[in-house]
A protein has these predicted regions:
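N-terminal alpha-helical interaction blocks
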Residues: 1-130
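Activation/maturation switch segments at domain boundaries
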Residues: 1-34, 121, 125-249
């Protein structure tokens, strides 16, 4: 069975991979200090995706060992290659927001989140791709300090629906270019935000931690208060239970 220690150790490894990517990002950023914004952008647009690709491939390679050793699943060698592939247009779009959007006070901070998300997605994509190919159901493994969004997605399958997520519905959400096409992505559990460290894990090898019970209670309470499965309303109620209770009266 997959243990909390297994997950913690793998997240630690992914964190080390991400830190190397962040160091490269900061080095690039400092090397561009003093340049006009447009000139700096042209360089960043070309170099940052290259950095992400290198470390995303490392994350995908590490995940092949993680899933094989802890969950007894070894996917095709092509899955590592697929997981390493980066949707460069998606990365550049997020980078452009960081550099030029109104109200952004720390472009580097936002760029850091973009890099982290797409590097770690290399590991998640390997698992989701393999689960999809083999038809294995999966759960979303979230840390105890996860945000409300991740708590909700982590508990939806193990609680309300009582069955694992289907990767056939969710795997493409983490970003595979043309395959990123499905609406309602959050409803399938395959959406991961910046600085998220949730991981897809084989359902029949994972026992949800005790704190999932508390999260499920929070989710059920929010669902009762808003009376809908609308994602935004549920998130608001989970973050503001007292206000939601007052609105319901």
């Amino acid at each position: 069975m997959l243990t909390t220690k297994d997950l913690d150790e793998f997240r630690l490894l992914l964190g080390q991979i991400n830190r190397m990517a962040q160091e490269d990002l900061v080095a690039l950023w400092r090397g561009l200090e003093g340049l006009p914004a447009d000139d700096a952008w042209r360089i960043l647009e070309q170099t940052v995706p290259d950095v992400v690709e290198v470390y995303r491939a490392s994350a995908a390679e590490a995940s092949s060992v993680f899933y094989g050793d802890t969950q007894k699943v070894r996917f095709s060698s092509g899955d590592i290659s697929k997981a390493s592939q980066l949707n460069r247009e998606q990365v550049v779009e997020s980078m452009r927001y960081a550099m030029f959007a109104d109200g952004v006070t720390s472009p580097l901070l936002i760029l850091s989140g973009v890099v982290q998300k797409h590097v770690i997605n290399g590991a998640r994509e390997y698992g989701l791709s393999g689960f999809e190919d083999t038809g294995v159901g999966w759960f979303r493994a979230a840390r105890a300090g996860a945000c409300e969004f991740c708590r909700m997605l982590a508990t939806r399958s193990v609680g309300k629906y009582g069955a694992a997520y289907s990767s056939a519905e969710a795997a493409s959400v983490v970003g595979r270019g043309k395959r990123q096409r499905r609406t309602g992505a959050a409803q399938t559990g395959g959406e991961f935000h910046t600085n998220c460290m949730c991981l897809p894990v084989r359902a029949d090898m994972f026992t949800p931690p005790d704190y999932y019970d508390r999260w499920l209670s929070e989710y059920n309470q929010a669902s009762e208060l808003v009376g809908t499965n609308d994602l935004k309303k549920l998130m608001w109620a989970m973050r503001n239970p007292q206000k939601a209770l007052a609105v319901k009266g």
